[in-house]
């Protein structure tokens, strides 16, 4: 899982070096957004794509790891969800302090 890396490069290099189908990466979208100055969250998906197995999904304002409900921060949630829909084998965990508002957001925007 990415924690505070400025880009996906080091994680991709590790996965490439291990080169084992049992090994995969977890992308925490909210963590990626806390280092947005270096690599925006959407830009993490493509390089990680061959190794991506799981995503932690929550929102924030780009500074703190707030774990806000989807739509309560500044992240491009619709664009992220659209990009994730192209990765049907990747599982997603909602990592919000309260999941109900995120489920309402997903339903209101046609994702559920």
Which residues are covered by each model-predicted region?
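Catalytic cores of phosphodiester-bond-cleaving enzymes
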Residues: 1-2, 107
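Histidine-acidic metal/acid-base catalytic patches
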Residues: 8-112
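Conserved anion-binding
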Residues: 2-3, 10
